[in-house]
Every structure is written in structure tokens, then in C-alpha cells.
Amino acid sequence: MSTCPFNDVFNSTDSSMINTFLKNVQVLLEAASYIESAERKDGKCEHGYASTFPSIQHSSYQRQRKFRNKKCNNNHYRSTHNELEKNRRAHLRLCLERLKTLIPLGPECSRHTTLGLLNKAKAHIKKLEEADRKSRYQLESLEREQRHLRRRLDLLRDGGGSLEAERIRTDSMGSTPCSERSDRSDSDQEEMEVDVESTEFSHGELDSVSTASTSDLDDHSSLQSTASDEGYSSCSIKLAFSS
């Protein structure tokens, strides 16, 4: 499309130039009408420039539409919030009922508030933690004692053979002196019997023995009388004399 200044077109007497200008104006008008129809159809500008000012009817319709959409969104949000709140309260009641079955509440369990129930649960948890700590300490003590007893048992098993050998050796050493003492006593008894059998008395010795026996009898009678005076028993004196 050729271009030319407006003054030249208006002042020119050339018909070809005027026809060209008119054709260009017609093309521009067709393009403007096409764009306007497209804007009315789609509601937006395809060329990127500012669109024409919408009509009053169209703007009121848009406002009503936005208001309805906003109202629907608010109603949906409110219903969703109410549903979530209802589910939360139901879950909280369920948790509180389970908590009542887990902790000791006493006879007036129906009068407990949510805060009081949570405080009692907290105190009960502390008691359980303390009991668990004591149980772990006792378990560790028992494990240490068990290890100590196992070590002692292993030592006794390892030293059982040596202890048995030591006991047998001690028994054998204890039996040897006893046998020696019994053999010695038997030999001494045999020697005494031999000495008694080999002893021979002469006539003088027999007289001295008889005299000694007579004097012993006199002494015995005197001792018996003395013992009777002193309160001693004659049987005990006889036993002492015979010994």
C-alpha cells in the first residue's frame, strides 16, 4: 500500500492518486469493522490495544455474576469450615473418652473438665515414666548379678577337676597316718605280750611280791576306813586301787 501526504492528495488533480487514497480508507474501515465485531464476539481485544468501553448493561451483568460467584464461594467455604469443625470436635470427644479409660480418675469421673482430664493424664504419664525408670534400673542390676553368677559358675566348672583331685589327695594323706598309727599300736601290743610271757619270777621275788601284796591289802583297808570317814565310796577306792 503506497503512502502519500494528505495535502498532496487533497490538492492534487490526479485521479489515480485520489482513487488510491479512497481504496486505502476503505481497507482501513473494513479492518476497523472486523476488529469491532471480533471484540463484541469474544469480549476482548485481539490486537492488544485498548478495547472500546463496555456498555452499561454488560458491566452490570458482570457485577452480578461476580457477586453470585463470590456468594457461592463464601457459602462453600462456610460449609467446608463447619464440616471440618464438626469432625474436629467429634475426634476430640473420642480422644477424651479413650483417655478416660487409660488413666485412673476416681469415683467422680463424670465431673472432670477437659483441662482437669489433661492435667491428670500428664501426672499419670510422669508416674509411668518414673516407674519405667526404676524398672530399667532394677533390670540392669539383675543383669549385672546374672553376669557375676555366670562367671562364678564358669570358674567352678573349670576348677571342679582340680578341686576333686585335691580332695582325693587330702583323703589319701589323711588315711596314711591312721594306718601307720594302727600298725604302731598293734606292734606295741605284741611287744607287751612278749615281755609278759618272757618274764620269770624267782622265789625271793615271789616272797617280796606276796609281802607287797599284803602291805597293799593293809593299806587298802586303812584307805577304805579313811574314805568311809571322809564320806567317799568304797567302790571308787577299789576302782582306784585296782587301777
Swiss-Prot record:
Coiled coil: none annotated. Its main location: nucleus. CDD domains: bHLHzip_MXI1 (cd18930). InterPro entries: bHLH_dom, HLH_DNA-bd_sf. The keyword DNA-binding applies. Residues 188-198 have a biased composition (Acidic residues). It is found in: Nucleus. Residues 222-235 have a biased composition (Polar residues). The keyword Nucleotidyltransferase does not apply. Residues 76-128 form the bHLH domain. Keywords: DNA-binding, Nucleus, Repressor, Transcription, Transcription regulation. GO terms for cellular component: nucleus. GO terms for molecular function: DNA-binding transcription factor activity, RNA polymerase II-specific; protein dimerization activity; RNA polymerase II cis-regulatory region sequence-specific DNA binding. Residues 164-235 are annotated as: Disordered. Efficient DNA binding requires dimerization with another bHLH protein. Binds DNA as a heterodimer with MAX. Transcriptional repressor. MXI1 binds with MAX to form a sequence-specific DNA-binding protein complex which recognizes the core sequence 5'-CAC[GA]TG-3'. MXI1 thus antagonizes MYC transcriptional activity by competing for MAX. This is Max-interacting protein 1. It comes from Danio rerio (Zebrafish). The gene is mxi1.
